[in-house]
Design a protein with these regions (language model features):
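N-terminal targeting signals for export/organelle localization
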Residues: 1-46, 50
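Conserved Rossmann-like nucleotide-binding pocket used by diverse enzymes
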Residues: 14, 45, 58, 72, ...
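Short loop/turn microsegments at loop-to-beta-strand junctions
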Residues: 44-45, 67, 167-168
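Short, acidic, Ser/Thr-enriched surface-loop or helix-capping motifs
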Residues: 51-52, 173
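Short active-site neighborhood of thiol/selenol oxidoreductases, capturing the structured segment around
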Residues: 59-87
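Structural microenvironment flanking redox-active thiols in thiol-disulfide oxidoreductases
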Residues: 84-144
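Thiol/disulfide oxidoreductase modules built on the thioredoxin-like
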Residues: 138-173
Length: 173
């Protein structure tokens, strides 16, 4: 009898603990990663950039997809190669999942041309159908980095918009 009671109590506890509750995730908009709960859905600003194959890439290419974004430059001697290698591990891990993509923005578009990005992609064996290395106008890339991804922790409105952006973060979108 006691076993039946314990079974029923266990089943009741199990069922109650499986209750699905919907909670909104915070997004982070400050350098210290303090979450900001917002009632309005945050969106990555519209962009139109060029990938390592010379193709135009826009927000529409990522609509309905989960993607991981980052900011890098091809001549970076420090963290960028490590980030690229880690992103490559993720690309390989999700190579058969069409819902997951990758997007790497150069922060040195004056140097990282389409051909430079193409060579960089070959060096790291990047699958261009899944992972876009993008370049474009510096102002557009930096606007998207600051307003969309909050990637420039040191940027203040009174500071120069020409400040160099460099971050070691991946952004899950």
């Amino acid at each position: 009898m006691k076993n039946k009671i314990f079974k029923y109590i266990f089943i009741l506890i199990f069922i109650c603990s499986c209750k699905i509750s919907k909670q909104r995730l915070p997004y982070f908009d400050s350098y210290d990663f303090s979450p900001k709960w917002n009632s309005v859905d945050h969106k990555i600003p519209k962009f139109q950039l060029i990938n390592q194959n010379g193709d135009t890439i826009t927000n529409n290419d990522y609509t309905g997809k989960i993607y991981i974004a980052d900011f890098f430059f091809t001549t970076c001697p420090g963290i960028c190669p490590k980030l690229t290698k880690h992103m490559k591990i993720l690309e390989d891990l999700y190579s058969n999942n069409d819902q997951i993509k990758f997007l790497s923005h150069t922060v040195m578009p004056w140097h990282d041309s389409v051909s430079v990005l193409n060579e960089y992609g070959k060096r790291y064996d990047i699958e261009s159908e899944k992972w876009n290395l993008v370049t474009g106008e510096k102002e557009e890339i930096y606007r998207v980095a600051r307003d969309g991804y909050f990637a420039d922790k040191s940027f203040k409105a009174q500071e120069s918009a020409n400040e160099f952006i460099h971050t070691e973060n991946f952004y899950l979108i």
